[in-house]
Amino acid sequence: MRKFIFGIILGAALLCGMKARAQYNREYFFWMGRSSMMNNDYQEAIRTLNTLLRFDEDAFEGYFLRGIAKYNLDDLLGAEADFSTAIRLNPVYTQAYTYRAITRSRLGNYDDALQDFREAIDLRPDLPGPYYSRGVTRLLNQQFKEAIDDFDKFIRQENKVADAFICRGLSYLHLKDTVRAYDNFNTAIRTNRENPGGYNRRGGLYMEQKRFAEAEADFNKAIECDSAYLLSYFNRALVYSDTNRPMLALADFDKVIQLDSTNSLTYFNRAMLRTQIGDYNRALDDYDKVALYSPNNVLVYYNRAGVYAQLGELEKAIDDYSSAIKLYPDFANAYIYRGRLRELLRDPQGAKKDRDTAQKKIAEYRSRLSDSTYSIYADTTQRFDRLLSFDSKFSGGSFDRITGHNGGHEEMRLLPLFKFTLMRPDTVPTVERYHVQRVEDFRKRVDNEYL
């Protein structure tokens, strides 16, 4: 009997010990998962949290942390699913609503994102964070007045966050209120003089207003604050290009590519700049990179065709014009230039066909101008915008990037494809053909229209 009682007591003690050990392990896995995330080791964090969730399927915080790790690895759908599970297990989990909203904003699902922000704010109207994040989402969704209202509410509680002033300044800028935009960018700089974002945004506004010296000074300051801040190098390169300093511009584009070797927009701008200074072979190398990283961009093939033509590689130029036409069949200029090259390659029928097609496309375009509703442009414009897009992001995928340091779109632009100079008629240099009399005599003897 004593042995039986002792066995029961021993079994109970072991069960208690196992329960205590399981509880200890649960906290251990949480701690290990958080530690891995603090060290930016998100894959290890996911492995650790997977182990936790296998033993405790109701650990809503585990799903929440795993969602953050997935977000930082750009697994946005997986992150959204984990945040949704956390909310299902704990319907009043404010942070889960906030971060699911941010994830949905990244996915372009603005309506559901704004609904999640409403839930978070209804649960905790005293927290400033959701107002800021909702303001960023509204800024991305082009609801600029509503975004300003959210940033106002955030700033009333947190007036030492420079990024809030930057985002509010961007909202005013989109409303064409440059005075308030400048005021907010200046406040952001005064709030945190070590934050490159304020200098970069103000410099961008200076650049748009052709105040290049002030823009350059701001971009220099932004780079001084953060020597790895890509957008400042990129924007300063645009200033150098606009002020006819191509070698300095190339050096800054080189720096951007050194820091981000897959940035197709930077390769494209560097290719155009190299073309302008006659460095055609290296321009081709850059266009090849753009075609690799943004294969559906119509301008890549169109511009590269022009470089091939300059180098006398007419067949390759025709192939690129054909690629541009395949992507955008209404591209009249591509037909025109392909037709000219076909003439040079003794293909008069192909050349005539391209000329006729180009004239037809131009006539169709002109006829559309009479459509006062512009409805006929709706699909074509959106499609052409996609054909001009580049697979480039200067911002990363972390929560800091979307809710902190960058706050909205990082605006990048192309170098101008053409530059024009207005001159008086008597100062315009006349174009003089190289004249050799023997060549002229030969042309007359042969009497062929293709010479």
Predicted regions and their residues:
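Canonical positions in the second alpha-helix
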Residues: 51-52, 85-86, 119-120, 153-154, ...
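Structural marker of alpha-solenoid helical repeat scaffolds
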Residues: 55, 89, 123, 157-158, ...
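Register position in tetratricopeptide repeats
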Residues: 38-39, 72, 106, 140, ...
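Eukaryotic alpha-helical solenoid repeat scaffolds
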Residues: 303, 309-310, 326-451
